[in-house]
Amino acid sequence: MRCLLKVTIPVETGNATIADGSLPKTIESILAECKPEAAYFAEENGKRTGFIFLDMKEPSQIPALAEPWFLAFDAQVEFHPAMNVDDLKKSAPGMEKAVKQFRRPERPKAA
């Protein structure tokens, strides 16, 4: 299953690993292990954040994917199922069924 692995590095840890030169080498090493489809890095809420897209074959991979970030950076790690455009197209029948089954009637708007 395609997943977004979101990694948030605390400012203090990020600063320390930049100062000692280990941040880029460690990230490169972790990414070499997890073999992502894509990896992007940006600021989110004032912290260094990685958005890493990868194919997770089974949930038992979660510790192997998360632990390097915990151990190297004291990072916060989140996993989110993700879809590409083809996946989204395939999901259309399920969405249509949900709309028919669960959509609430429109409520009149107040004047």
Protein language model features and the residues they cover:
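Conserved, structured core segments of small domains
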Residues: 1-111
